[in-house]
Amino acid sequence: MDRLAESFAAGGIDSTLDALGQYFKSEKKYHELFEILKMKVRRKLGLPIVYDENAIELDEKVRNQLEDGLLEACKEAGTGLLRDGKIREGWMYLRPLGDRSGVESLVREIPADESNLDELIEVCVSEGVAPGYGFSLVLEHYGTCNSITAYETQISHLPRADQENAAEQLVSHLHAELSKNLKDVISQQEGQAPSEISIKGLVEDRDWLFGELTYHIDTTHLASVVRFARVVQTESCLRLALDLTEYGRRLHSQFQYQGEEPFADVYPSSALYFQALLGENIDAAIHYFKEKAEATDAYHQGTASIEVYIDLLTRCDRTQEAIEASIAMLPAGTRTVGLAPTLYELSRRVGDFSRMMEVCRKNEDVLGFATALMQKNA
């Protein structure tokens, strides 16, 4: 306190604020540092160093400068807290900046351990800072079951790219686990390690692997991961997902769980879907999912089957067909579940908004028509 008084006597307010800033920074007292940084910003702008609710309203220029200065203060305090391992507190300051990639870089520098694991996962997944990294921590430290729950309750509500990242991790993890389990059983039974690499190769001509009570991985996990895999884009991971269906379809009937349309018969229908995305059996897959879509009453059964069909057409580079299917099968005002691109997104993909304009005119959708008109002439 005496040193502060001496600092104030020697240099006034500015000297005191500088000294306090250095002190709190050296002591890693970042909440207090933030308060000092706020005072410095306000003093620089000629404002009282402590906010007064009765103060006059600021003009736009000063208000913008104040906001910029406060954001810089948030950045310094939040970065310090993160580097000190105080993850939730650091994120509290860094959230207003909107710089998620910068925060992700900082978070990845923090070694994960028992003391901070839950905080890391919360900020990365729940707060959306780095969902892929956070999900990898869940998978590594809490296992498959908890990862599936996290995917269902949190990841599935995030943007498609984040879903893909997490789904790829789960597919790779489960495929590796199942492959190892199968190889161990085969080696024990046959007296030597199998030469086959893929799951399909391991299970073909080995019917003895599949008895009434026999399985080599949690079958509920398998069904869930195959379902999640439908968002996957990369060829290598799609092939792993297809490989998982080769095992699943050979399981005893009691482990063949009923799925939701259009994947009621989970493994055969999923296999057909993955094959189409890999450029195989495209016509057969499109025919199958078209029949499922056409058999659906959107008002009473929901739109999932229709959306899966539209999305499959799009992913198989049949976007014009997807546009026509969307127009024909999803009447105006239909509530969708977000599995397929919208008519606007499909039109933008092909660079042609003519059909969208026609439909919007017919349905007296003024906003949709105007949007398509402006995009067409942009």
Enumerate the predicted regions with their spans.
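Long, low-complexity, acidic Ser/Pro- and Gly-enriched intrinsically disordered regions
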Residues: 1-95, 102, 107-378
